[in-house]
Regions:
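Sec-dependent bacterial lipoprotein signal peptides
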Residues: 1-16
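Subset-of-secretome marker
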Residues: 18-216
Length: 216
């Protein structure tokens, strides 16, 4: 019985070690966040997704699209406008925004006009976007490894978070996932009053060309 007991204990220990994501010493939180901010400032393009769970008190409910560091972007945004969800397709090219709702064709507005509602191109903007959000984090603590990412608990100031998620005006105790190899942001979970906003990124630096939608 004793050899069998030892074998069972050994298996339990091995499984526990694997499931913990352990393996090597975890990096210091502030150092990792500094690397992450620098990595995000160097990003040339990315695919992004913003989703909500529950009923967080923000007008942006969902967004999916592509971004370039130059500020061009395209995709779809779902906004809560006076209690009614409205999905808008968009293409931001230079200072011109092409957009359309559920019906009708594309119309145009300026980037400044779009910014009154939500400008997704700010996400990769170094001084207001994700890079600045990571640089402004306080008390980052690396909790462990999940898949190929470090899971980090940290707090983001509301002023900076609100640039990316309009309607946020208070500090957010967030969980973020940073790629181990590149330190780029893979995902961020932002608990807010009423629910949670999750921001995800993929396809970093893939070739992206944003073109105007067909006329008519």
């Amino acid at each position: 019985m004793l050899p069998k007991l030892r074998l069972i204990v050994a298996v339990i220990v091995l499984v526990s070690a694997c499931s913990s994501g352990g393996g090597g010493e975890l990096p210091a939180g502030p150092d990792l966040m500094k690397r992450a901010a620098e990595a995000m400032r160097a990003v040339k393009s990315a695919t992004f997704s913003i989703a909500t769970e529950g009923k967080p008190q923000v007008p942006l409910k969902q967004a999916d699209g592509r971004l370039t560091a130059a500020g061009d972007a395209d995709g779809t945004i779902t906004l809560d406008v006076f209690g009614i969800l409205q999905e808008v397709s968009f293409a931001v090219i230079g200072e011109t925004v092409h957009f359309k709702g559920a019906t009708g064709g594309f119309q145009k507005m300026t980037r400044a006009q779009l910014a009154q509602f939500y400008d997704p191109s700010v996400i990769l903007e170094p001084t207001r976007g994700i890079a600045q959000l990571l640089a402004s984090a306080t008390g980052p603590e690396v909790e462990g490894v999940e898949g190929s990412s470090y899971r980090v608990a940290t707090t983001f100031p509301g002023q900076v978070t609100g640039q990316i998620i309009p309607g946020v005006n208070q500090g957010v105790n967030a969980k973020i996932w940073l790629d181990q190899a590149t330190a780029r942001l893979a995902k961020a979970s932002l608990p807010l009053p009423g629910g949670t906003v999750t921001v995800s990124f993929s396809d970093y630096d893939a070739p992206v060309t944003i073109t105007p939608p067909p006329a008519g």
